[in-house]
Amino acid sequence: MPSLLLLFTAALLSSWAQLLTDANSWWSLALNPVQRPEMFIIGAQPVCSQLPGLSPGQRKLCQLYQEHMAYIGEGAKTGIKECQHQFRQRRWNCSTVDNASVFGRVMQIGSRETAFTYAVSAAGVVNAISRACREGELSTCGCSRTARPKDLPRDWLWGGCGDNVEYGYRFAKEFVDAREREKNFAKGSEEQGRVLMNLQNNEAGRRAVYKMADVACKCHGVSGSCSLKTCWLQLAEFRKVGDRLKEKYDSAAAMRVTRKGRLELVNSRFTQPTPEDLVYVDPSPDYCLRNESTGSLGTQGRLCNKTSEGMDGCELMCCGRGYNQFKSVQVERCHCKFHWCCFVKCKKCTEIVDQYICK
């Protein structure tokens, strides 16, 4: 009997440990920024053990790639900011709630919103690491070594210092996916389905950055004649990556896990998702009202647009509860004039405008 009690206690502690690990995330590096590599002078292991939100596998990578951690934090921050931009006019607006779990319990639901968040965060890491390589901030990588594109004109030079998206992609895959790959759930279980969903969306985010990187060129020549061009590989603006992933969010595929431990479409009539598509396994929670169990913050107190018929409109944003009107003073630059030479001088104008918030 005592041995059975010990086994039960051990299993319970293991379950709690897993829940605690899942509640925290490497995303917290965005809210608890890692200082520049000088912080590691005191030794890698103590610092890596103190960083919040890392899984065991991610801590090992931290110890091996100390100088990368600040840029992983930058990537997470970039992803979170882009998420908040893309969803600024939605009921769920990608709000951060604390420094450990970052987004709170809402990420424990395998919804479309969770799918987007995983994708855009992984994309942020690829973006940050790729740029850091080009800027010479990391000792393990440098400028891009991508082969010369076949369609590049012969008289154009290939060899500028490009963003190292190949390295950024590989490192982001190793680091971000480490948390999911070290989990061991029963084949065909809901938990395994969630792991597969996370891995799919991580990959979709990385591929968005990788696929959207393009050739950039600079002209050389007398008086801007552009008789010669030097070209290199350059990352797309991250806003464009966010726009692409938002399109993928809108067309995300509903999936379920099979007994064989694979994801399949809930509706087989739909097109099978590619590695560049987002997938989800749970319906979205009700974001209208605050709900501690789902992590929904509700829309009470959110600004809305009285004249819009879209998701930012008061009717939809406030979920039919109505809204309150208030006056707001806005200060803007106005009556700007150019003065020779060379500056622009503006006045400050105040305007009282009507604004609306959800009840």
UniProtKB/Swiss-Prot annotation:
Palmitoleoylation is required for efficient binding to frizzled receptors. Depalmitoleoylation leads to Wnt signaling pathway inhibition. One of its GO terms (biological process) is positive regulation of fat cell differentiation. Disulfide bonds join 83-94, 133-141, 143-161, 217-231, 219-226, 288-319, 304-314, 318-358, 334-349, 336-346, 341-342. The keyword Membrane does not apply. A lipid is attached at residue 223 (O-palmitoleoyl serine). InterPro entries: Wnt (IPR005817), Wnt_C (IPR043158), Wnt_CS (IPR018161). It holds the Pfam family wnt. Keywords: Developmental protein, Disulfide bond, Extracellular matrix, Glycoprotein, Lipoprotein, Secreted, Signal, Wnt signaling pathway. It comes from the Eukaryota. Glycans are attached at residues 93, 99, 291, 305. It is found in: Secreted, Extracellular space, Extracellular matrix. GO terms for molecular function: cytokine activity; frizzled binding; signaling receptor binding. Residues 1-17 form the signal peptide. GO terms for cellular component: cell surface; extracellular matrix; extracellular space. Its main location: secreted. Belongs to the Wnt family. Ligand for members of the frizzled family of seven transmembrane receptors. Probable developmental protein. May be a signaling molecule which affects the development of discrete regions of tissues. Is likely to signal over only few cell diameters. Interacts with PORCN. This is Protein Wnt-5b. The gene is WNT5B.
